[in-house]
Amino acid sequence: MAIAGTVPTELGDKRIRDLLMQYAVPAIIAMTASSLYNMVDSIYIGHIKDVGSYAISGLAVTFPLMNLATALGTLVGVGASTILSMLLGQRNYKAANKVLLNEVLLNIIIGVAFSVVTLSFLDPILMFFGASQNTLPFARDYMVIILLGNVITHLYFGLNNMVRASGNPKLAMGLTVFTVVSNTIMDPIFIFVLDMGIKGAAIATVLCQLMALIYTARYFFNQNNYLHLPKSLRDYKLDIRIAKDSLTIGMGPFLMNSAACIVTLFINQQMLKYGGDLAIGAYGIVNRISFFFIMINMGFNQGMQPIAGYNFGAGKYTRVKRVFKLTVICATIVSCVGFIVSEFMPDLTVSLFTNDPELKELADKGLRLANLAFPLVGFQMVATNFFQSLGMVHKSILLSLSRQLLFLVPLIYFLPVFFGHRGVWMSFPIADTAAIVLSTILLLSLFRKFRKLNDGDDPAILGSKIKQA
């Protein structure tokens, strides 16, 4: 088995286009599978007889809570997988196994705590997140089951990250694809055949993750693997130092995911206030459609990161600029396809989620408005991840949070006063445009500094100048 941390020298020599495809395609498959995983539930739930419109609106109400659960997962998973990769690179397998064990224990502790607290106050939380008397029963039915299986979800995604970090990305991708395919098959059985409605969608989701978790657990309980979990329960003790390091490293991604939770909460509240239950359902549909294209671009970004980071560290700035430009081109093409789908065939895509005429009309108009600036969104995403790839974390976080908190949240509260729920939709392209302008300013500053350096110059020189900027 390949060891994570082994330096792939091809990153500095192989043709950039071939490298980007080599690294991006598996990530795109995994990201697309993740987005389809979320879409499948929405599509089937939206077609539940007689109550589909309110059911999909109830599902949309749960988005902030789901985002918060994801944020807690990244808090543990990102930090632990980062430390694990470093230890494997040092061939310190004993310490790596301790990190793996602590990742499991932290996920159990956080998963149980989140479920207990949330279940204790579920109805007030859902009402705060935008539920009404019409949508609360559906949101509650879905979340009760999801929360009961929350530990399974945390353990599965956490261990899947560890599989990837340990040098087996194909297995991690395969498990993701498996959950999507099995969920697609099981959803209609539980929702329609067994007539369980939105509860059936939640049960199918948890069962699919349980099956994937069982396989992943078997992988890590194999004592012949250099990375494995202990069999004796006496060995399951939390190491405070490892836990602290993992949570510290994961704090950045946690904050960014938490920002998404806050933004979704505000959107739901404003949609309910100015447009009613169906407006929230329309946002849920638009969110799922847009998310599909965004996740493809995330795959390109994941492919770019190791290439840009390696060549930056090696002082090969020409290759750094080349991979950035190629990734921007690819992401822009994807974003333009998303724009065409949104502007010229919204009815076709929205019809996948609902047959309700009123909900379809709201989602059609919302999709057109929300994605007006979509052709440039790919560029902004690449810029954010480019700074992260070069170790300029503060600029990356600034670009990510500015779009959501600095630009989008004020617009969500300001524009509906004048334009009703249409103002919420209008907030997206305006915030995207503002974020694109900020990204361009930061990138121009960076590339001006690149021009002063030749390939082979010490990257620390560039880094020190950037810190002073």
Locate each region found by the language model:
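Helix-terminus/linker motif at the lipid-water interface of multi-pass membrane proteins
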Residues: 32, 36-57, 126-133, 189-196, ...
